[in-house]
Amino acid sequence: MTTRTEAVKAYLLDLQDRICSALETFETDTRFIEDAWTRPAGGGGRTRVIENGSVIEKGGVNFSHVFGSGLPPSASAHRPELAGRGFEALGVSLVIHPHNPHVPTSHANVRFFIAEKEGEEPVWWFGGGFDLTPYYGNEEDCIHWHRVAEQACAPFGPDVYSRYKAWCDTYFHIKHRNEPRGIGGLFFDDLNEWDFDTCFAFIRAIGDAYIDAYLPIVQRRKAMAYTEQQRQFQEFRRGRYVEFNLVYDRGTLFGLQSGGRTESILMSLPPQVRWSYDWKAEVGSEEARLTDYFLQDRDWLGLTAPKAAV
C-alpha cells in the first residue's frame, strides 16, 4: 500500500467514525453495530448499520478497501484503457433512511481508485458526492443542502459546483421513469484533473460537508407530525430509490461484479417499500408537488427560502 493510499484510508476511517457519531446524537438508545469483514479475493472493510432507531429507521455507513488483479466491467467500460490493470478501491458510502416522511433520505460517497500495470505509471482517480431524496419537499432544506455543497466546492474553482451539480442531476436520473431520484447535490467521478494533493483536499471537503449539509435538516424535521397516508407515500417513493440502486447505480454494479460483499453493497436499500400499480398523486396535493416542483431541474441557490418555513 502506497503512502497516498495509506493517507486516503486513514481519512476515510476517520470520516466513517465522525459521521456515525454525529448521526447517533439523534438516537437515545440505538447505536450503530459494526460488522468487520474480509473479502476472499482481496481486502475487506467495516460495515456499520443502525436500525429501528427513534429517528433513523435504517442507515448504513460502510468503509471498504478491496483489491484485485483486474477491474470489473462496470469500472472499465467507460475507460477501456484500464482493462487488464490490477486495482485498489477504497471508499466510504452511506445511506440514511429516516422514519419520518418529512426527513429526506440522504446518500454520500467518497472513494479512491488506483489501477496499476507492470511497466506503466499507476492511474488514480477520485469520485464521490452527496445527494438528497425528499418525500415532502421543503425549499429551506433544498437551499441549505445546495448552499453547503457550493461552499465546499468554492475553494477549488468558480465552476466546480455548477459542473458537479449538473453531473449529479444527470447521474441520478431514473431513465425508465423519466424522473430524478431526488433534488441532487454533487456527483463526480474519474477526478484527477488537479494534482493528487488538491484532489485529495477536495474529497476531504466533500466528505466533511455531508455532516453540515444533512444534520440541520434532520434536526428541523424529525419531530414533525405525519399521517399514515404520508408514510405510505414515503414507502411508495422509496420504490424509486430501490429501482435506481439496483438498475443504474455504478457503485452497486461495481460491488456485485467485483465479488464484493452483498450485505454491505445492499445496505443502501430501505427496510419497507411499496409499489402500487399506476398510482398517481392527486392534482394540487403535497405529493404531486414533489414531482411537479421539487423534482425538477432547478437553481436552488437562486431561491430565497420562505420566511414561514419551519
Curated annotation (Swiss-Prot):
Reactions this protein catalyses: coproporphyrinogen III + O2 + 2 H(+) = protoporphyrinogen IX + 2 CO2 + 2 H2O
Region span, Important for dimerization: 241-276
Positions contributing to a divalent metal cation binding: 97, 107, 146, 176
Keywords for the protein's UniProt record, in alphabetical order: Cytoplasm, Heme biosynthesis, Metal-binding, Oxidoreductase, Porphyrin biosynthesis
Active site: 107
Cellular localization per UniProt: Cytoplasm
Protein's UniProt keywords contain Transferase: no
Subunit relationships: Homodimer.
Main location as per UniProt: cytoplasm
Protein name: Oxygen-dependent coproporphyrinogen-III oxidase
Keyword ATP-binding: no
EC number: 1.3.3.3
Annotated site residue numbers, Important for dimerization: 176
Function: Involved in the heme biosynthesis. Catalyzes the aerobic oxidative decarboxylation of propionate groups of rings A and B of coproporphyrinogen-III to yield the vinyl groups in protoporphyrinogen-IX.
The organism's taxonomic lineage, starting at the top: Bacteria, Pseudomonadati, Pseudomonadota, Gammaproteobacteria, Pseudomonadales
GO biological process terms held by the UniProt record: protoporphyrinogen IX biosynthetic process
